[in-house]
UniProtKB/Swiss-Prot annotation:
It comes from the Eukaryota. The keyword Transit peptide applies. The active site is at C304, H388, E390. SUPFAM superfamilies: Carbamoyl phosphate synthetase, small subunit N-terminal domain (SSF52021), Class I glutamine amidotransferase-like (SSF52317). This is Carbamoyl phosphate synthase arginine-specific small chain. Belongs to the CarA family. One of its GO terms (biological process) is 'de novo' pyrimidine nucleobase biosynthetic process. Residues 224-415 form the Glutamine amidotransferase type-1 domain. Keywords: Amino-acid biosynthesis, Arginine biosynthesis, ATP-binding, Glutamine amidotransferase, Ligase, Mitochondrion, Nucleotide-binding, Transit peptide. It catalyses: hydrogencarbonate + L-glutamine + 2 ATP + H2O = carbamoyl phosphate + L-glutamate + 2 ADP + phosphate + 2 H(+). Its EC number is 6.3.5.5. One of its GO terms (molecular function) is ATP binding. GO terms for cellular component: carbamoyl-phosphate synthase complex; cytoplasm; mitochondrial matrix.
Amino acid sequence: MFKNIARLASMARSAPRTTASFQTRFMATTASGTASASATPATFTLQNGPVFTGRSFGANRVVSGEAVFSTGMVGYPESMTDPSYRGQILVFTQPLIGNYGVPSGKETDPFGLIKYFESPHIQCIGIVVADAALKYSHWTAVESLGEWCKREGVAAISGVDTRAIVTYLREQGSSLGRITVGEEYDAEEDAAFVDPGEINLVRRVSTKQPFHVSAAADVENPLHIAVIDCGVKENILRSLVSRGASITVFPYEYPINDIAHHFDGIFISNGPGDPTHCQQTVLNLRDIMYEKPELSELPIFGICLGHQLLALAAGAKTVKLKYGNRAHNIPALDLTTGQCHITSQNHGYAVDVNTLPAEFKPYFINLNDQSNEGMIHTEKPIFSTQFHPEAKGGPLDTSILFDKYLGQVHQYRAARKSGVDTRPNKLLVDLLPKQRIGVEIDAWDYVQ
């Protein structure tokens, strides 16, 4: 019996898969729903690669950007609102997407942070799925995935062979892609692909003015952290304030080096695109790390793009990965303890570990592709990770790194000269806005 099962499984794996078969399965899945499937044809094209036809269930627009894939089984609202996906077309490997709908983006937690999203809007410019669920069920859901995409102006295509797309990207490497709705594919339009890597995407997602999020009212004398916003996720801010820290968030190019002495710690956030676009941020960090002896013990923590910017500030280099790491189940080894952690990741660039200066050593390593996942200073309280300890979505194995960082911040504050309070004026801080400023998505650079 087991031999027969194995033989049938082998036959199924070797059977040819066509776009037509996926379109049929899409129609069969959605036909049982309460809403009708869109009859509008759509095309997903990889530059210099295959063309996939399907059905549109999002906004009626043509978009172009970097095609990337995520293997996360859940968490599509969090992924789609993650600013690190700005300018990208997100391919989901999970076969059925949208079955638990989309929660409200207006609900907030006790700190005033968005409860279910990682930013106020969808950040990817398009999504590609095998099956899109038109029937959804969850107690937090207020609309379907398709309705959300239409309202946010995001192109979405279903009924395509996502396994073939991922296989191509994995073997050929990162590629530009385009979603066309209601039009036939025209090979002469291949020159119309837009490369978001040539755009400073951080400028698009960073707050335009400083804003402040206070710790809980019952926290006495809270720590005060300066956050450099390169596209910070809501759950990163929540991970800090829920541990008793007040945070002031600054635009990515803000001269933080001029006011760093007012804070108990510096944090550099995640964000989209090529880290070399953020030259001023790198110079500001380098000034804090190497040119201000009075800040030599100031704790600094960076995540994702923040990790890469810290590495650049230290004199290291970054490289573009073949197809990036975007998943919720990537093993990372802590080189200081020998422990393995399952991590959430979303990045297309990595730090070249061979270029790290002598004062830094590798902190974590990716056990899948051996790429660098973090660095730590040999003497100062400075460390960073390529993965996301805050998850959302994904495991919380490494959330203890926030505790480690805030422990260093507590030590730094305690060691400061007694009787000298250099922290920002509380009245001025309280007058700051309480949320991101000027990051509304009113125009895309990559919509044709």
